[in-house]
Amino acid sequence: MLQTNNYSLVLLIQLALLTFDLFVNSFSELLRSAPVIQLVLFIIQDIGILFNVIIILLMMFNTYVFQVGLVSLLLERFRAMLILSALYLTLSICFHCWVMNLRWMESNRFVWTDGLQVLFVFQRIAAVLYYYFYKRTTEYLGDPRLYEDSPWLRDAFARARQ
């Protein structure tokens, strides 16, 4: 079971990773003259997104709902967040690779092609949705009812057995 002090630490780590992600999305263009630093920030950002997904999955695996075998209930509840996380990670990696490929040798050259601008917009929209759904999922996974036996869980288990 996730204890209150453990949940606070996990929540702090998740929010720190989300804040770093937001920081890189907001200010990475200011570092275009230093492509190595920008590359390192992009790599750390992608690893942070991956860590956030792993943390959410571990929190899901830790719930009583998962332990009694109602995985479908969790997947139904968190499907949007899991899909958005995968989409956001994919769009971020694609955007980072494309920008670094175009900008590596000539960092002050205008590299914003039409395709890159479209990818940029989709990546940023996915980022906003990812932040919202991730934070909502994190708060929902802090609900103590997910970590103990309860009447609604017994009803869900009975429906799943039929």
UniProtKB/Swiss-Prot annotation:
Transmembrane regions: 7-27, 39-59, 80-100, 110-130
Cysteine pairs bridged by disulfides in the record: none
Family statement drawn from the similarity comment of this UniProt entry: Belongs to the TMEM138 family.
Main location: membrane
GO cellular component, one term: vacuolar membrane
UniProt protein name: Transmembrane protein 138
Keyword Membrane carried by entry: yes
GO biological process: cilium assembly
Subcellular location: Vacuole membrane; Cell projection, Cilium
Residues making up the signal peptide according to the UniProt record: none
UniProt-listed PANTHER family: TRANSMEMBRANE PROTEIN 138 (PTHR13306:SF6)
Keyword Magnesium listed: no
